[in-house]
């Protein structure tokens, strides 16, 4: 056992030395913005999954799994998307509990995702209004992150300062989630109200893209103290890229994000 531990410790040390000597700007160091624009396909041509109008594509989905999902979605037709009380967020400083807040937040997103997939599969319109309610409810949340990730400062004291949005794991994930909703439901949303997609873009830009472009986040690393990026970095950045690639009115180009 001691030999095994020593082996992995040595492997870790060697790996650290190897990675420290490798260039960190593999993408930006290889391609210029102009070259990226030539390499990347136009956003309109990027179709990672069949659109809701591609019935032939969705006919290939696993029927048994989709029927189960459809039944689950039917059980949510009477679900009311709740707001999250401030006192649920305050629990993080009052009792240390993070689960009550997260249970409400995660449930809302799980329900919305189930309704979304059911509507995509069935395409009869009966889940649209409930999806609209879900999107609007998420957009009206004060923060898309979780209280456990709030700064431990008297200024916050268990609540988000909505004038100073910052990006944690779940905020970034929510931005990508809403961009997928828009990707699949955009045309149906336009038939309901143009304000739906406009709200998604507004909230995503305000809460996610603008803070990421204009302010330093500790998980980014390498500012003045020599800190390294932490494990939040790849998750948030991957959601950042996915979100921008599907948000067609985001003010910064996708190639600009990549560099």
Regions found by a protein language model. Name each.
Residues 21-93:
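Low-complexity, Ser/Thr/Pro/Gly-enriched N-terminal "stalk/linker" regions
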Residues 86-101, 151-164, 220-228:
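Internal amphipathic alpha-helical repeat/solenoid segments
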Residues 73-84, 131-149, 195-220, 257-259:
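Long, well-ordered core segments of solenoidal/helical folds
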Residues 1-23:
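Bacterial Sec-dependent N-terminal signal peptides
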Residues 158-259:
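Active-site lining segments of carbohydrate-active enzymes
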Residues 72-75, 97-118, 243:
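Short, 15-30-residue, compositionally biased linear elements
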Residues 107-121, 133-137, 172-183:
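Non-membrane alpha-helical segments in proteins
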């Amino acid at each position: 056992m001691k030999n095994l531990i020593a082996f992995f410790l040595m492997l870790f040390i060697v790996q650290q030395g190897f990675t420290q000597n490798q260039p960190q700007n593999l993408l930006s160091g290889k391609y210029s913005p102009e070259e990226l624009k030539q390499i990347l396909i136009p956003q309109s041509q990027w179709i990672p999954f069949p659109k809701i109008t591609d019935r032939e594509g969705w006919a290939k989905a696993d029927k048994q799994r989709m029927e189960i999902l459809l039944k689950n979605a039917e059980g949510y037709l009477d679900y009311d998307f709740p707001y999250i009380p401030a006192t649920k967020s305050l629990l993080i400083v009052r009792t240390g509990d993070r689960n009550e807040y997260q249970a409400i937040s995660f449930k809302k997103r799980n329900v919305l995702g189930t309704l979304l997939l059911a509507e995509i599969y069935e395409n009869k319109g009966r889940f649209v209004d409930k999806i609209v309610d879900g999107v609007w409810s998420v957009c009206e949340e004060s923060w898309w992150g979780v209280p456990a990730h709030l700064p431990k400062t008297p200024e916050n004291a268990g609540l988000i300062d909505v004038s100073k949005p910052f990006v944690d794991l779940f905020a970034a994930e929510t931005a990508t989630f809403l961009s997928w909703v828009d990707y699949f439901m955009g045309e149906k949303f336009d038939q309901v109200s143009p304000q739906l997609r406009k709200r998604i873009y507004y909230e995503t830009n305000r809460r996610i893209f603008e803070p990421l472009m204009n302010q330093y986040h500790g998980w980014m690393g390498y500012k003045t103290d020599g800190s390294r990026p932490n494990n939040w970095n790849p998750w948030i950045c991957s959601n950042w890229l996915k979100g921008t690639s599907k948000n067609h009115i985001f003010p910064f180009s996708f190639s600009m994000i990549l560099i």
